[in-house]
């Protein structure tokens, strides 16, 4: 009965143009915070889950110790925000700073992933808003990221932020072995 009342409420709110993205189906204690070293195992779980979704499981080859050292060692090269739901890491936004000779400092979002159980409940939006705050704090002029062209849910999510597509660019990478 609670779910039916909730759904009826959502439909009525949508009729009046009220943003329902931040309403939750059940009470949750969600905290968006900077990642700490102890989060790395759960973060790697989310990264593997994302790779599975993107049909690229075999591409996750990073050694766990290297991953931890790269984020929390003396010369850290990445940082992350996590979404903690009732004390468990259920979302991740991993980023690093890069430099554009045309634009200056840019925050590059490597991965934004929320456990599928919690998608559509406003957690991704809260993480994106927190990431925008980090970019402003670090004096970055923009945030860049990539999305697979078939990942329509992600594209739809990002388009809510009035984003620009970098049409005409081809991505390259070179394996160093």
Predicted regions: what they are:
Residues 82, 88-96:
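Conserved beta-strand in the GNAT
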Residues 120-133, 160:
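Conserved acetyl-CoA-binding loop-helix of GNAT-fold acetyltransferases
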Residues 31-43:
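A short beta-loop-alpha structural element at the N-terminal edge
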Residues 136-146:
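Conserved GNAT acetyl-CoA-binding A-motif
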Residues 44-70:
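Conserved GNAT-fold acetyl-CoA-binding loop/helix
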Residues 112-119:
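A short, internal acetyl-CoA/4′-phosphopantetheine-binding micro-motif in the GNAT/acyltransferase core
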Residues 125, 137, 149-168, 174:
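Conserved active-site alpha-helix within GNAT-family acetyltransferase domains
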Residues 70-82:
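A short helix-loop-beta-strand connector motif used in the catalytic cores of GNAT acetyltransferases and
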């Amino acid at each position: 009965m609670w779910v039916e009342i909730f759904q009826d409420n959502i439909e009525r709110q949508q009729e009046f143009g009220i943003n329902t993205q931040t309403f939750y189906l059940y009470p949750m204690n969600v905290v968006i915070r900077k990642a700490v070293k102890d989060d790395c195992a759960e973060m790697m779980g989310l990264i593997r889950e994302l790779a599975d979704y993107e049909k690229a499981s075999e591409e996750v080859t990073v050694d766990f110790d290297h991953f931890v050292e790269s984020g929390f060692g003396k010369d850290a090269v990445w940082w992350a925000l996590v979404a903690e739901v009732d004390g468990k890491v259920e979302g991740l936004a991993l980023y690093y700073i890069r430099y554009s000779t045309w634009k200056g400092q840019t925050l590059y979002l490597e991965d934004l992933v929320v456990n599928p159980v919690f998608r559509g409940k406003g957690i991704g939006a809260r993480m994106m808003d927190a990431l925008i705050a980090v970019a402003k704090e670090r004096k970055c002029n923009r945030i860049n990221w990539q999305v697979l062209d078939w990942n329509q849910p992600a594209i739809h999510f990002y388009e809510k932020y009035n984003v620009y597509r970098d049409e005409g660019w081809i991505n390259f990478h070179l394996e160093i072995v």
